[in-house]
Swiss-Prot record:
PANTHER family: COBYRIC ACID SYNTHASE, DETHIOBIOTIN SYNTHETASE. The lineage of its organism: Bacteria, Pseudomonadati, Pseudomonadota, Alphaproteobacteria, Caulobacterales. Residues 251-439 form the GATase cobBQ-type domain. Catalyzes amidations at positions B, D, E, and G on adenosylcobyrinic A,C-diamide. NH(2) groups are provided by glutamine, and one molecule of ATP is hydrogenolyzed for each amidation. Belongs to the CobB/CobQ family. CobQ subfamily. This is Cobyric acid synthase. The active site is at 333 (nucleophile), 431. The keyword Ribonucleoprotein does not apply. It comes from the Bacteria. Pathway: Cofactor biosynthesis; adenosylcobalamin biosynthesis.
Length: 486
């Protein structure tokens, strides 16, 4: 089985982007490639064609491989619901919510599941590119590991270790990993890659030689800072803490409050990339700007908990004042639920049973009951000819008089969402409404904005090709291919 696992010296070192870029690179060379991540922790999820869910990063990597995503590409997905607990999704289906300690007891069975999914992918591919999680150097997590070295040994996959030079101390990170790993794990690593370098690469030649001397691992190259990676979805909310702003020429101001369990925030990437917008994620403790044109309440993994969090920031007061001034408000999924009169969880789906008043901007009520809805959707925005495509991923049913004025009309006749009588507040369950150019233009037209044309998916595809070309020039691809067994 030809394969390579990309592990990192920490979280957010660029593993997901490098795997996506390498997927596209080897696909462009004519290989059948499949992405794989044994265990992911993220509230950014994607719906597969068979109605399952996987990490959004693996869905992107499937795009890079020019193949539909499947649940086997990310067989274990952890979706945090609290600081110590998460919803566990196995091969696309929710199996329950577990505290961190209780989850440890599941790992032996889950390791077998991940290896089986990996082998199913390998059977249909020339190459499987595997992404680790966090860092193998977190040796306190080594026992029972299924995300990094535990999986690599069980599936017999060679490893390349990534160091992020943009953070600094990359020599210490790689040499330190070599120091703390046991002999078998060190031997599993067949080389290292420096990532996110800015400037003249020759300035770090001595640093790379020192890493080789201290670790004995071969140098597989140094990838530059990839500006085009900004067109790709971020996997973790930590990326939102470093917003990239490009002011100048933007007119409409759009803000998205960063809820504590914010989910699927990558759906706003088309807005972040639109030069006609002043778009930002609003950090906790920051008031909603008085000159905001549109406030978007995003999806969340825990609606009731984040409704409490929203009020703790004072955002409820700000949003209601914004609406009274004639500002526009849009709610997506959990954000849509918050805009209604009440949210109830009688069976404790998200935690302890309970209910809370919503913001009352839409005449609807939500009850968190029933099976999770996971499906791709398409249709038109009500009152326009603009077509949209997206996906639903939620628990709960929303009903009320406001639903008589739906926001979306699905192909086939059903409807979704609600719109206020004055048309300034709207919400729906569907994620991905800004992806298609015509839907984005229709949604932003009331703000007086001529949105950038074109589907965001085409921009992502072009970015993947650009990243692949850069990696072809900057990494030792022939050595990487030999290690992988291609």
């Amino acid at each position: 089985m030809a394969s390579l696992m990309i592990q990192g010296c920490g979280s957010d070192v660029g593993k997901s982007t490098l795997v996506a870029g390498l997927c596209r690179l080897f696909v462009n060379r004519g290989l059948i490639v499949r992405p794989f991540k044994p265990q992911n922790m993220s509230n950014n999820a994607a719906v597969t064609e068979d109605g399952g869910e996987i990490g959004r990063a693996q869905a992107l990597q499937a795009i890079a491989c020019r193949t539909p995503p499947t649940v086997h590409m990310n067989p274990v997905l952890l979706k945090p619901q609290s600081d110590v607990g998460a919803q566990v999704v196995v091969r696309g289906k929710v199996v329950g919510a577990y505290q961190a300690r209780a989850f440890q007891g599941l790992k032996p069975d889950l390791l077998a599941t991940t290896v089986e999914s990996y082998r199913l992918l390998a059977a249909e591919a020339d190459l499987v590119l595997v992404e680790g999680a966090g860092s193998p150097a977190e040796t306190n997590l080594r026992a029972g590991d299924i995300a990094n070295m535990g999986f690599a040994h069980a599936a017999d996959v060679p490893v390349a270790l990534i160091g992020d030079i943009d953070r600094g101390h990359v020599i210490a990170a790689l040499a330190g990993a070599h120091l703390v790993l046991d002999a078998a794990d060190r031997e599993r690593i067949k080389g290292f890659i420096i990532n996110k370098f800015r400037g003249d690469p020759s300035l770090f030649d001595e640093g790379r030689r020192e890493i080789v001397a201290r670790t004995g691992w071969p140098d597989l190259g140094m990838a530059p800072w990839l500006a085009s990676a900004r067109a790709l979805p971020a996997e973790d909310a930590v990326a939102l803490e470093r917003p990239v702003r490009e002011d100048g020429g933007r007119r409409a101001k759009i803000v998205v409050p960063m809820l504590s369990r914010i989910a699927n925030f990558d759906e706003f990437d088309p807005l972040r990339a639109d030069p006609s917008l002043d778009f930002s994620f609003l950090p906790p403790g920051t008031p909603v700007p008085g000159d905001a044109d549109l406030v978007i309440l995003p999806g969340t993994k825990a609606t009731l908990a984040d409704l409490t969090f929203l009020r703790a920031q004072g955002w409820d007061i700000d949003i209601l004042a914004h609406a009274r001034r004639g500002g526009r408000v849009l709610g997506v999924c959990g954000g849509y639920q918050m805009l209604g009169r009440t949210v109830s969880d009688p069976e404790g789906v998200e935690g302890a049973p309970g209910s809370a008043p919503g913001l009352g901007l839409l005449d609807v009520e939500t009850v968190l009951l029933g099976d999770k809805v996971l499906r791709a959707t398409a249709g038109r925005l009500v009152g326009t000819d603009a077509a949209f495509s997206g996906y639903e991923m939620h628990i709960g049913r929303t009903t009320g008089q406001g639903a008589a004025r739906p926001m979306l009309a699905f192909d086939g006749g059903a409807a979704d969402g609600a719109v206020s009588a004055d048309g300034r507040v709207a919400g729906a369950y569907v994620h991905g409404l800004f992806e298609r150019g015509e839907a984005r233009a229709a949604l932003l037209a009331p703000l007086g904005v001529a949105a950038s044309s074109g589907d965001h998916a085409a921009q992502v595809d072009a970015a993947l090709d650009e990243i692949a070309a850069v990696l072809e020039r900057s990494l030792d691809i022939e050595a990487i291919a030999r290690i992988a067994g291609v």
